[in-house]
Amino acid sequence: KNDLIGLIIPQAYITLVGMTGNRDDVVIASDRGQNAGANGNFNTIGVGDGFHAKDLTIGNYCNVDLVYERDTTKNHTKRQEAVTQAQAVTKVPGITDMDEWFFENCNIISRLNLFSRDDRPKRSLIKDCHLECTDDSLGTGYITIFENCTFSLFSNTPCGGASFYMQAFLGCEFTTQLSDNKTITLCKNTKPFAFIDCDFKGDMTGMEWKQSNFSDDIRQIVSNNTLNGQPLTISPDYPDLSVTPDEEQMKAFKYNGEYNIYNLLNGVGY
């Protein structure tokens, strides 16, 4: 709903660019969440079809301090310690056809939830970004590609519902700071993932594709992933769920040393 969005940008193909090139300098911020200044899951920004953000920060600081190094008088203390649903990015209500979100060299910051869960946009590319979150945060729409991003994970179910058709992490680095449960469980239901050239660091001890009831009719793509410098096997008790592409198959994801973003986002019907 509109009253749960701080900044609404309904127009198609709008680009927001931070003028300094330093993503820490330009901050779009809110500090409201569920039962914390809002009656519902509050969102910092709502955007439309073809939205592009570059060289800036989008954050919901309901449960995390805003530290603004360029001018410390603009620092802002979190609204509350208790973590509640406080999202950073959502779609604008009422737009039925939505595609092509692109975040480049951005910080996307919150705790519980980051992107709102929806069947739109059809495709999102998140490149060279830093993301911080707890649960139910990463991925939205049909296809989400994270390329060369860094993540700070503060809880162990970061993807929640995840994207419907594919959620790919390519050349990404994850740092974990978890509570008692040191196993990352990516998703609450069966969704397709790809992890290629990813590095996990911190206190996590292992990773599972989902919480329970593993499906036999889906395969996850994995290649060259590490945990604290050692090879990482996801869901080791269910090895048949993970497939490592051979040289020819890998061209769908990585070609001539570069990630094949064009192929991954060039979906039929889009």
Q: For the regions a protein language model found, what residue spans apply to each?
A:
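Sequence-level preference for short, compositionally simple segments enriched
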Residues: 1-270
